[in-house]
Amino acid sequence: STGSLGLDLALGVGGLPRGRIVEIFGPESSGKTTLCLETIAQCQKNGGVCAFIDAENAFDPIYARKLGVKVEELMVSQPDTGEQALEICDMLVRSGGVDMVVIDSVAALVPKAEIEGDMGDSHVGLQARLMSQALRKLTGHIKKTNTLVVFINQIRMKIGVMFGSPETTTGGNALKFYASVRLDIRRGLQIKKGDDVIGNETKVKVIKNKVAPPFRQAEFDILYGEGVSWEGELIDL
């Protein structure tokens, strides 16, 4: 379960599918990490073991705890390079002892050559190559051990696009291809209590779904310091 009733319904299988790769993408502070932490909390409630690969070095245990995550039981890794992050992910998946792995985020998976190189060096296509190699390897292991792997991704703007959407996700096309489910998450209107902003309306579109019909949508409220508002969703449903 994702912690959101509406999104679980939109996904068609009651939540994120196991043994699959899922991509959650959207603009900054749209609720991507919150949604992942909610899913981790639900997984842990059902006795699952979860891991969080924090490539962005932005994991906040206090916030995670507020969302119901058992931080003591969560495996958190802060790798130095993209290669290391994906190796750790592969190792966790192959072990068969983990139910869910979250990678936050694809944009922060910087190849070793780029980290060790100089600022002005050109590293065109390195990250895309790294992703496609890693995903080719990962897919088989994920299927065998029935692990859920979630990649959080950011949105970038393509330059000079005249027609169609100028938005694209980072890390090349491999993830689009290998992901069984792709979620596009957007922040909507602010939720106010008097003059104070207490949260945001959030819209999630299921852009790709290989396990149920795609293109369904869900809307829910994310309240600051609390996460997805269950009560609001029950009233809406």
Curated annotation (Swiss-Prot):
Q: Which residues bind ATP?
A: G26, P27, E28, S29, S30, G31, K32, T33
Q: Which GO biological process entries does UniProt record here?
A: DNA recombination; DNA repair; SOS response
InterPro entries reported for this sequence: AAA+_ATPase, DNA_recomb/repair_RecA, DNA_recomb/repair_RecA_CS, P-loop_NTPase, RecA-like_N, RecA_ATP-bd, RecA_monomer-monomer_interface
User: Record's superkingdom?
Assistant: Bacteria
Instruction: Return the GO cellular component terms, semicolon-separated.
Output: cytosol
Which terms are listed as keywords in the entry?
ATP-binding, Cytoplasm, DNA damage, DNA recombination, DNA repair, DNA-binding, Nucleotide-binding, SOS response
Q: Where in the cell is it found?
A: Cytoplasm
Task: Please list the GO terms describing molecular function.
Answer: ATP binding; ATP hydrolysis activity; ATP-dependent DNA damage sensor activity; single-stranded DNA binding
Name the Gene3D superfamilies for this protein.
P-loop containing nucleotide triphosphate hydrolases
Q: Which CDD domains match?
A: RecA
Q: What does this protein do?
A: Can catalyze the hydrolysis of ATP in the presence of single-stranded DNA, the ATP-dependent uptake of single-stranded DNA by duplex DNA, and the ATP-dependent hybridization of homologous single-stranded DNAs. It interacts with LexA causing its activation and leading to its autocatalytic cleavage.
- Family statement drawn from the similarity comment of this UniProt entry: Belongs to the RecA family.
- List the protein's name: Protein RecA
Q: What is the species of this protein?
A: Neisseria elongata subsp. glycolytica
Which gene name does the record give?
Answer: recA
